[in-house]
Amino acid sequence: MTLTISTTYIIITSAIITLYFPIAVAQTTLLIAQFRRNSDRVHSKFRKSHIEMPPPILVQKNYHNGRKVIVVITTNGANAEVVDKLLSILKSYMLPIRLFVIKEAYDKHAYPAEEIVVPADYNCPNKSRAKLRALHYGSLWFKEHGFGKETYICHLDDDSVVSREYLEYIYSMPYDSGQGHIRLREPGKHLFSTLGDMWRISECASFCAYFNSKGKPMTAHGEGMVIRADVEEKIGWDYGTYGAEDVIMAQLIVKNGYTFGYIPGPIFIAPPLSARDFYKQRRRWIWAMLWATPFIEKINRKYVYWALYRYAIGWSGFVGFFLSLPAYFIHFQYSYAIIAFSMFNTINYFFFYQYGIFKTNKRWSLLMFILQYPVSLYEGGTMIYSLLFPPNKMKYDVIKKI
């Protein structure tokens, strides 16, 4: 039987709408659960040079239980002033933590923390470069200087910082490793990049929190990852990949029999300051995952399937409705189920971003609603840009931070 163009169109769009529906259901269910449990209520608002916190819900003051907590910021020196600002915030918490900065030999900036300088001639056995090289050297340095099972390392990028209660929780957390949820600091510097990052907030509140609480880090990210020092030293960071070190480390932690959990505290990140930086950042993430897929597949094939499904279908939440519009005007041929799926997908897509707005600045809610589709196109364009203009595999894109 020969299919007509309209029938083929109906089949394809119905498939796209149906494939996104499980994501929509999961996202909605998990975010509603967050509202009901208020499990991410430690959602401090970042303000300029300090963090304003609600009354603490984590009663953990035993800083002398034998456990040591250190914070490590890895930087290439491009954002030295930002790192200094983040270190001053961490110091203001007045906690018995040690602060370290892993930096390159060419970085002559003197940071207000203990410095670990990666020698210019240092080479990883698996030829890891850039951040992976620095992290791997750092793990060896910590081992050499006696940091072991009693020490927990909180890793930060050179634009991220965690709250005081996040660090307090580490002193008693019952896992070998873990991670919290993302929030924004310095939002609004670039409107579309800020609104685009609302997706990351909701992603963390739903899938990150859920999978981490189950001990399966299926959506891990680099900011705020906490690892016991001896575990990190055993696994290392020398993967020889372009990036995706956060995902790989999380999978290897579980693969090697260690535990991974959810830390009920915020990690503050800064949105990119321009469209150019936003696209360069997303391109780096996309290609890091694509190039690392064969490596990750050997560790956890389920993660690869999940990531591919999310990347391939995640964009269709907002286009499913538009894909079906021609059929509505030409001839109403969709089943009631597909119509219901399409409506639910669209509502969920708006709700997903509104949750991020709720956790950042409620006054932006109407603006987010009006700009929902332009922002979605802004984000979706990163995939097209990445495929058309792949990065230089021997060069690591660096963006300006604040």
PLM features: what roles do these ranges have?
Residues 85-97:
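Short, acidic, metal-binding catalytic loop of nucleotide-sugar glycosyltransferases
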Residues 251-268:
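Catalytic donor-sugar/metal-binding loop of nucleotide-sugar-dependent glycosyltransferases
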Residues 67-72, 98, 248:
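Cell-envelope/extracellular polymer assembly enzymes that use nucleotide-activated donors
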Residues 153:
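Short aromatic/hydrophobic "clamp" motif used to bind/position activated sugar donors
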Residues 243-249:
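Acidic donor-binding loop at a coil-to-helix junction in glycosyltransferase catalytic cores
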Residues 156-172:
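Acidic donor-binding/catalytic loop of UDP-sugar-dependent glycosyltransferases
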Residues 2-41, 313-393:
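Membrane-embedded multi-pass helical conduit in multi-pass membrane proteins
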Residues 121-142, 170-235, 239-240, 279, ...:
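Long helical/loop segments within the catalytic core of UDP-sugar-dependent glycosyltransferases
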